[in-house]
Structures are given as structure tokens and as C-alpha cells.
Regions:
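A general structural signal for short secondary-structure boundary/capping elements
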Residues: 92-97, 164-167, 186-194, 209-215
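A transmembrane-helix-recognition feature enriched in membrane-embedded lipid enzymes
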Residues: 178-204
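N-terminal type II signal-anchor transmembrane helix
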Residues: 2-40
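Acidic/proline-rich low-complexity IDRs
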Residues: 10-13, 83, 203
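Short linear elements at protein peripheries
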Residues: 201-220
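Enrichment for repetitive, rod-forming helical segments
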Residues: 9-13, 76, 197
């Protein structure tokens, strides 16, 4: 009876230990790649600022979380002139993160050649994989909330991209942050495993030179 009980306890505890161990690895491997804004100028030859997409509102406008990412990405662009890569889910006609991101960015005076769209950033992994293999990016800044940066940076490092993370936590939203932190633990574990096998993204396509004009990526 005791052996059975120990086995049951082990079967319950072991998966929990694995989940949190992998999460710990992802966080620890990435935390020193998160930089402050006053460190940006010290990093040279950056190919792009990757702004990762997320939920849009029912009316098609960016959610508060996405707006924060876009504001931070725009702020860095205005300081550095480094090209923007806006990557999100545009998998259906009725759901379009990417053009919502573009419209937000283009609400200010900006050179259209400097704004690139990736319509097939269906996941964090897809966005970063395509940044390397479609857009030819070797070195980049990644803009998203801190909880998300650990995973994004871990994926980038695993794929051989020199990436630095910049937080987009411009406005406090603790309730949203806590909910996403819980989901993120499992997402980190999933992408930890994915980076071992390094599958290609769901959708590839023709290569796009990030040093060229972003207008070629516009569909509207």
C-alpha cells in the first residue's frame, strides 16, 4: 500500500518539478538579455526592432497590452532609426493583428520604408523563426512585456539570433499580468522542447530583405 502511495505521489510531483525546472531554465538563461533603455545606444549593428503581436479588440484596435508594445517600439525607433518588424497573427480575413499594429504605428509621421509586416507570426516561435529565416535578421531588439521576454529571448538565442529584450510595461495591469504569467509557465516549457527540435514555422514563403523597403510587406 505504501509503495502504491509513493508511486502515486511521485507521478503527481514529478511533472510539477519538470514544469517548474524548465521554466526556471528559460528565465535564468534569458534574464541578462533584458536591457534598460539607456543601454540601447551601446549595442550596434542591430537589424530590426521586433514588436510581437497579441490580442486586438473586437473593433480591430490594439488591446492595451499591444498598444504598450507598439508605443515602446515606436519610441525606440524614433531614438535609433532602426527598422520596425511588426509580427502577429493575420491567419484569417476577420482577425488581423498586423494591420492593427501598422495603423497604430502609422498614426505618427514615420518613413514607410522602415516598417515591415510579418503576417504569419502565429506564435512567438513563428515570429522569431521567420525573423531569422524570412527577414534575414541576425541581431535584433525584441519588444514585449517582461513576462513574455524570457521566452522570446530564449527562442531567439536557441535559433542563433543575437537578441536583446526591452520591456513594454508602460502601464500597470497586474490582473492581466498575473493571468498571463500562469499561462506563460506552460508556454515556456512548450517552447523549450520546441527549440530542441527546431521545427520550421507554420508558414514560410519568399525571403524579404530587412535592409530593403517595408512597403513590399503591406497588403493594404
Amino acid at each position: 500500500m505504501k509503495k502504491k502511495l509513493l508511486l502515486i505521489i511521485s507521478l503527481i510531483i514529478l511533472p510539477i518539478v519538470i514544469v517548474f525546472t524548465l521554466n526556471f531554465i528559460v528565465v535564468k538563461k534569458s534574464e541578462d538579455r533584458i536591457i534598460k533603455e539607456d543601454e540601447i545606444d551601446a549595442i550596434s549593428d542591430v537589424d530590426a526592432i521586433l514588436v510581437l503581436g497579441c490580442k486586438v479588440n473586437p473593433d480591430g484596435s490594439p488591446s492595451m497590452m499591444l498598444s504598450n508594445r507598439l508605443e515602446k517600439g515606436l519610441e525606440i525607433y524614433q531614438k535609433t532609426g532602426i527598422k520596425l518588424l511588426l509580427s502577429g497573427d493575420h491567419g484569417t480575413k476577420d482577425y488581423d493583428e498586423v494591420n492593427a499594429m501598422k495603423d497604430y504605428i502609422l498614426s505618427v509621421d514615420i518613413n514607410l520604408d522602415d516598417v515591415f509586416l510579418d503576417h504569419a507570426g502565429f506564435s512567438t516561435y513563428d515570429s522569431i523563426y521567420r525573423a531569422k529565416y524570412i527577414f534575414g535578421i541576425k541581431k535584433m531588439f525584441i519588444v514585449t512585456q517582461r513576462y513574455h521576454l524570457y521566452r522570446a529571448l530564449y527562442i531567439a538565442n536557441s535559433l542563433g539570433i543575437e537578441a536583446y529584450g526591452i520591456e513594454a510595461d508602460n502601464i500597470p495591469y497586474k490582473a492581466i499580468n498575473t493571468k498571463n504569467e500562469i499561462r506563460e509557465v506552460l508556454a515556456r516549457d512548450k517552447d523549450f522542447v520546441k527549440t530542441i527540435f527546431k521545427p520550421s514555422s507554420k508558414l514560410l514563403g519568399e525571403e524579404i530583405d530587412i535592409k530593403g523597403s517595408g512597403r513590399l510587406t503591406f497588403d493594404k
